[in-house]
Amino acid sequence: MAETNGLKDMIACDTRISAIKDNKLSYAGYDIADLMDNKARFEEVIYLLWNLHLPTAIELKQFEEKLRKNYAISDAIEQCILIQSRQHLHPMSVLRSTVSLLGVYNLKAEERSVEATYDQSIQLMAKIPTIIATFARLRQGLSPIAPRKDLGFAANFLYMLNGRLPSELEILAMNRALVLHAEHELNASTFAARVCASTLSDIYSCVTTAIGTLKGPLHGGANERVFDMLREIREYGDVDSYLQEKLNSKEKIMGFGHRVYQTQDPREKYLREMARELTKGTEHDIWYQLSKKVEICMKQKKNLIPNVDFYSATVYHVLGIDSSIFTLIFAMSRVSGWIAHIQEQQKNNKLIRPRSHYTGMRKLRYIPIERR
């Protein structure tokens, strides 16, 4: 029987966007393994999630042109990011507030037609990487780098973040990470976005709701804590003793186990492969080697295997992404899935309004205040 507490295993909606079954993840009918084996680009996957079919060459070209046309953010938005970057705010709070501001500055934000919603979706998808890269550089005292319309989604983000053109391997790694995190059925942030969409609120409010939900440590932030752990282990010096100490203290080891997958997370192996390829023969190899030792120890001690968060920490670090903004990268990818669910909810909408089971006291009588 499904659990009421946390709604585990309860079915809340029908969807054609993604499915998790028999420990496999599929996007609109395409197994994630098939997309990975064929090196599907993130733009293709965004199109797939929003349209429920893979694009033709012409459709993909037109879709990419729309995205690239909308990469840039206004001076007003950049100024708002600058102000926030000086306040030592949580990175997810900055993203949440800036996405909300995108809605404020879009004079057509309140339009609800299919065409208007699609245009708003394109703008959100295209501008969020620029917002993140701008924030990441400003908080380090660096000047923002303008996006390049001749670069694809993954390459453009890494260029804006690091100030140099990424290698083909780096582009592949970024694309893979984005595709693997793009969508994951009815997780907490996606459900929150659908609840908001069911009220017929605007898409900026729906995405802001999702970002606020992802900010919570029980949903987002796991790979950030994985890399913090790897740093601690490097200083500690011994993987086995470190893990045993944590386990004895009943502390959770981040990057292991999953709420839905009972055996292996089907996304994990692709990020493990990318972590190995990116670090091979470089100064970053220590992070991959530490990760492998942790993986082996956790298998021996707890019979647990890594999830998607574990090796993504090393991948992101090698790509020049600071661990404090790892969850922003999660959001940059997952916004594609959020938008797909928002659009699906609005096409066949019914207000999401569940009931609660009251467990408090009953039949109490009012007592005047002077007698209490």
UniProtKB/Swiss-Prot annotation:
The keyword DNA-binding does not apply. It is an enzyme of class 2 (transferase). CDD domains: BSuCS-II_like (cd06110). This is Citrate synthase. It comes from Streptococcus mutans serotype c (strain ATCC 700610 / UA159). The active site is at residues 258, 309. SUPFAM superfamilies: Citrate synthase. Keywords: Transferase, Tricarboxylic acid cycle. Its EC number is 2.3.3.16. Pathway: Carbohydrate metabolism; tricarboxylic acid cycle; isocitrate from oxaloacetate: step 1/2. One of its GO terms (molecular function) is citrate (Si)-synthase activity. Pfam families: Citrate_synt. Citrate synthase is found in nearly all cells capable of oxidative metabolism. The gene is citZ. The keyword Methyltransferase does not apply. GO terms for biological process: carbohydrate metabolic process; tricarboxylic acid cycle. InterPro entries: 2-MeCitrate/Citrate_synth_II, Citrate_synth-like_lrg_a-sub, Citrate_synth-like_sm_a-sub, Citrate_synthase, Citrate_synthase_AS, Citrate_synthase_bac-typ, Citrate_synthase_sf. GO terms for cellular component: cytosol. Belongs to the citrate synthase family. It comes from the Bacteria. It catalyses: oxaloacetate + acetyl-CoA + H2O = citrate + CoA + H(+).
